[in-house]
Amino acid sequence: GAAAIQNIGAYGMEIKDVIESVEAYNQLTFEKRTFTNSDCEYGYRNSYFKNEHHDPHIITYITLRLSKNPGFSVNYGNLKEELTKYPEVTLETIREAVITIRRQKLPDPEVLGNAGSFFMNPIITAEHFEKLKKQFPEIPSYPASEGKIKVPAGWLIEQCGFKGKNHGSVGVYEKQALVLVNLGDARGDEIALVAESIRTAVKDRFGIEPVSYTHLRAHET
């Protein structure tokens, strides 16, 4: 369900590229509905099911349309590098390479509590990026739609000194600054506080305010 809600993606591909339809149950009207791909209103890590529509819907089923002759998207730096270790590029070797990279960068949630990447990679105008490039020549980037530029949020956070640092029971993962980890007994408000301090620091330095993937909910007893 989360895949269809979030429009998950990595290395130049998103699940919206293969979703045919999504079935959802509305908890307010008690109705089931089948949404076409266009009904889902997919955008970058966004969909109809997020924001004001995220509460009523429970995703119960998705239908994917897969190609027998898929095209490969392997131009992202670390994926391209990892694939050089394989004799040929196939769907199987791409899968193995992606799994290897993710295991190196992301902690196991059964060992160290986390929700994966906490922040989205921001997409900014080319004009904004050129200004940043003059001030920070080493800033990495990837092309986005409509002539805009995607900047890795992990790099921005790392430049602000958060990577590998602990703030009480909340930590910024030492191998990937995008990931916030629960070091044992962190509460939601503590995680929110650390996330806000990261947002403020990045905005002050780069003029970019990172947006969270996650929805924090209050615990009710």
PLM regions and their residue ranges:
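Amphipathic, heptad-repeat alpha-helical segments used for oligomerization and assembly
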Residues: G168-S197
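A C-terminal functional module that forms or caps the active site or interfaces directly
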Residues: I149-F162
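C-terminal or internal capping secondary-structure element at the end of a domain, subdomain, or sheet
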Residues: G188-S212
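Structural signature of FAD isoalloxazine-binding scaffolds in flavoprotein oxidoreductases
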Residues: N7-N37, E41-Y42, E52-L64
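Residue-level signal for inorganic ion chemistry
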Residues: F30, I62, F119, I157, ...
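Conserved small/polar residues in nucleotide/adenosyl-binding loops
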Residues: T214-T221
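Oxyanion-binding "anion nests"
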Residues: P87-E130
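A conserved active-site cap/scaffold subdomain adjacent to cofactor or substrate pockets
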Residues: D55, I59-Y61, L66, F72-K80
